[in-house]
Regions:
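N-terminal segment of the mature folded domain
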Residues: 23-152, 300, 330
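Short beta-strand->loop
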Residues: 31-33, 124-126, 144-171, 185-189, ...
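Sec-exported extracytoplasmic/periplasmic mature domains
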Residues: 44-53, 76-80, 89, 96-100, ...
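Short helix-loop capping/hinge motifs at secondary-structure junctions, enriched
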Residues: 127-133, 152, 165-173, 251-258
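Positively charged n-region of N-terminal signal peptides that target proteins for export
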Residues: 1-5
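Ligand-binding pocket segment of bilobal, Venus flytrap-like solute-binding proteins
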Residues: 171-236
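Extracellular/periplasmic juxtamembrane helices and adjacent flexible linkers that interface
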Residues: 252-332
């Protein structure tokens, strides 16, 4: 009701006031997840130039970052976002279920509304003193693991499912052994932060743990910011992490920002934007640009797809809802 009254009032003001009195600036808010801060800071600058050239309007983009699940809950509970760029499809579906995003949002943009991808890797201290090579090593005695909480972080759910996929292959689908494997891994977790950036801070800046399970881009950013202190280990099995994007229909309709919000997400697929994504260590969906960065990205790693486990609705229900497998195996 409040939003309807706002929209009515705005329409009345627009009808009575000359357009030029409002100037030529439009503002939108992008609610995103933890590791995209630096990338969107760069992207927003080129998008503002693109929008100015295309329409003559100035645009200001506000960013909001945090654990993906927590961010989705904030939007569902009323945080105004013109667009959401979250860690996984399920988090956007939760906003859809709150009635703020129209059904079929996955088909509004290319590649199922996933303009870039990532995967999960390990970040270890230079020289790899614990000799960590694969997921098995994260279950050994004396190894301290840092990973975010899958109850609040989308990246953490990708981490968990990458480990689950490894256990699936190792134990040929025997869920009893798979659960035991995941339990041993989480018994070694020394800190369970609410989001991916918090986990990176715990490991890189606070010196907690021996290995950080991380988004590929987070690991590379840490190596860039702390040269000669860390190295990346790519496990034998990981997962194709597909962050998703969507326009928040209810918000853009009452704010009158649908055109600029839609173009904001569309332009993420442009060559210029795909280069920025690659520079920030996200994998571009443009295959040509991805291959141009093959010196950075390991394109030979065995990446499973979340669809192999029934998609995010099934995975969320089985693993991460209250009483799910994560609750079974994680001893607080």
């Amino acid at each position: 009701m409040i939003r309807k009254l706002f929209a009515f009032g705005l329409a009345a003001v627009l009808a009575l006031t000359p357009v030029q009195a409002f100037g030529k600036t439009v503002s939108i808010t992008n609610v995103s997840y933890d590791p995209t801060r630096e990338m969107f800071e760069q992207y927003n600058k080129i998008f503002e130039e693109h929008w100015k050239e295309k329409t003559g309007e100035d645009v200001e983009v506000t960013q909001s970052h945090g654990g993906s699940g927590k961010q989705a809950l904030e939007v569902a509970n009323g945080l105004d976002a013109d667009v959401v760029t979250l860690a996984l499809e399920y988090d956007i579906e939760s906003i859809e279920n709150a009635g703020l995003i129209e059904a079929g949002w996955q088909d509004k943009f290319d590649n199922e509304s996933s303009p870039y991808t990532s995967t999960i890797v390990f970040l270890v201290k230079k020289g790899n003193p614990k000799v960590i090579k694969d997921w098995d090593d994260l279950t050994k005695d004396g190894v301290g693991v840092v990973t975010p909480n899958p109850k609040t972080s989308g990246g953490a759910r990708w981490n968990y499912m990458a480990a689950w996929a490894y256990a699936d292959k190792k134990y040929d689908g025997d869920e009893t052994q798979m659960k035991d494997f995941i339990k041993k891994l989480y018994q070694n977790v020394v800190v369970l932060d609410s989001g991916a950036r918090g986990a990176t801070t715990s490991f890189v800046e606070n010196g907690q743990g021996d290995v950080l399970v991380a988004w590929e881009n987070e690991a590379y950013l840490s190596m860039r910011d702390y040269p000669d202190e860390y190295e990346i280990v790519t496990p034998s099995v990981s997962i194709l992490a597909q962050p998703s994007v969507a326009v928040v229909d209810e918000v853009v309709d009452y704010r009158g920002t649908r055109d600029v919000a839609t173009e904001y997400l569309n332009y993420l697929y442009s060559d210029e934007a795909q280069e920025i994504e690659a520079e920030n260590y996200f994998r571009p969906t443009n295959e040509k640009i991805l291959k141009e960065h093959s010196d950075v990205f390991d394109l030979s790693v065995d990446l499973v797809n979340i669809c192999d486990y029934g998609g995010w609705d099934e995975v969320q229900k089985k693993h991460f809802t209250d009483g799910g497998i994560f609750d079974e195996i994680y001893e607080r």
